């Protein structure tokens, strides 16, 4: 735990010098006890906050980029928006005056600085606001304030309610801190952006809160990161999927995009769309964009004769009505020794099924198991491969 005196020390010249010295320690699993003891001998009562800060900075680098001088708490770092996601949001708010009312240690402020016309940050936690001042600098106003008590006249308010309690995630938006419905009421007269967990029931959220703006689901490098509520004045659609990549380009889909797609049997490839597309309910729009079709109208798996660029697909080698015995026989016939199993719409645990299959061959394969109509079907596929490639049939290799 950090207090204000810790922040004052760590942000001072003496603290910076001590952090530079502490950063020479590895704090690996094998050296942690010895490093901590050495730090305690050298820095006494400051040893704990020095060790924590060095380790948090190392953990933060992959998520936030260059944070050599930043200060964090562990909880603040866990909830901090990844830099790529924050930059995407900032771009949508370019040229506006923005107030982040749950600014924490300043990850969103850093992305907004220089993009928005002006930026204000506030948080109820005095330690986090002190850290944000250190992290962002004096040119951005950061103050202590209750997120539910409007304290500026900024055009746009951003809120990122706490979604953890006692180390556990909260899935009910009314249990967030502050609750989502309270945030919506407090800023009903402003343009508002609210970050939420991507696993929310969006229909239920709209019904309970009356929210009528855009719900954007964002993924980064294949992992779904957040759902973001954009009030009507900022909305460009009802539903949006934003797929971001650390390297390369991403894409967006909305419910305004064409959604004409057929339901048909499997073609050469099966494609599992990005999680943001699935959570945003835009599978049909994705299929229409790439000339794909659905295997079942209720299931997110798509099929086609080619794989969209930058996406990994499963090349179909065989298909059969699902039964564990028949699947084991089909895999054995192809000398399968390792298998990736993905499942949709069928009550199966892939890890347990993989163990029960008892494969003894040498060829890596993939299996896609899905509900189609009233039954389940298994597709034996070549090992997953990226778009633009054609994987040879393992039996002919």
Language-model features: locations:
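SAM-dependent transferase fold signal centered on methyltransferase-like domains
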Residues: 1-397
């Amino acid at each position: 735990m950090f207090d204000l005196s810790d922040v004052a020390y760590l942000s001072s010249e003496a603290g910076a010098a001590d952090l530079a010295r502490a950063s020479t320690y590895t704090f690996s699993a094998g050296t942690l006890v010895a490093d901590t003891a050495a730090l305690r001998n050298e820095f006494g009562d400051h040893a704990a906050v020095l060790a924590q800060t060095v380790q948090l900075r190392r953990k933060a680098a992959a998520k936030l980029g260059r944070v050599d001088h930043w200060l964090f708490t562990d909880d603040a770092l866990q909830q901090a928006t990844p830099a790529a996601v924050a930059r995407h949001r900032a771009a949508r708010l370019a040229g506006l005056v923005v107030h982040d009312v749950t600014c924490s240690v300043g990850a969103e402020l850093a992305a907004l600085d220089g993009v928005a016309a002006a930026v204000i940050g506030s948080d109820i936690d005095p330690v986090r606001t002190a850290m944000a001042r250190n992290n962002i600098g004096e040119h951005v106003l950061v103050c202590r304030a209750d997120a539910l008590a409007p304290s500026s006249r900024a055009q746009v308010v951003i809120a990122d309610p706490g979604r953890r309690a006692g180390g556990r995630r909260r899935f009910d938006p009314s249990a967030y801190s502050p609750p989502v419905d309270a945030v919506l009421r407090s800023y009903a007269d402003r343009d508002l952006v609210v970050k939420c967990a991507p696993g929310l029931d969006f229909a239920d959220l709209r019904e309970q809160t009356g929210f009528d703006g855009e719900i954007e689901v964002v993924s980064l490098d294949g992992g779904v990161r957040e759902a973001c509520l954009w009030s009507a004045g900022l909305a460009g659609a009802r539903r949006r999927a934003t797929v971001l990549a650390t390297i390369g380009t991403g894409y967006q889909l909305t419910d305004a995009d064409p959604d004409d797609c057929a339901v048909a049997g499997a073609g050469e490839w099966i494609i599992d769309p990005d999680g943001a597309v699935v959570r945003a309910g835009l599978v049909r729009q994705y299929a229409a964009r790439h000339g794909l079709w659905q295997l079942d109208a209720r299931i997110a798996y798509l099929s086609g004769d080619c794989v969209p660029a930058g996406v990994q697909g499963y090349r179909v080698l065989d298909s059969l009505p699902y039964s564990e015995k028949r699947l084991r026989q089909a895999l054995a016939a192809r000398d399968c020794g390792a298998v990736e199993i993905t499942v949709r719409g069928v009550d199966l645990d892939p890890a347990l099924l993989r163990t029960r299959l008892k494969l003894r061959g040498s060829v890596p394969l993939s299996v896609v198991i899905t509900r189609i109509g009233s039954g389940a079907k298994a597709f034996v596929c070549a090992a997953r491969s990226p778009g633009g490639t054609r994987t040879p049939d393992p039996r002919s290799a």
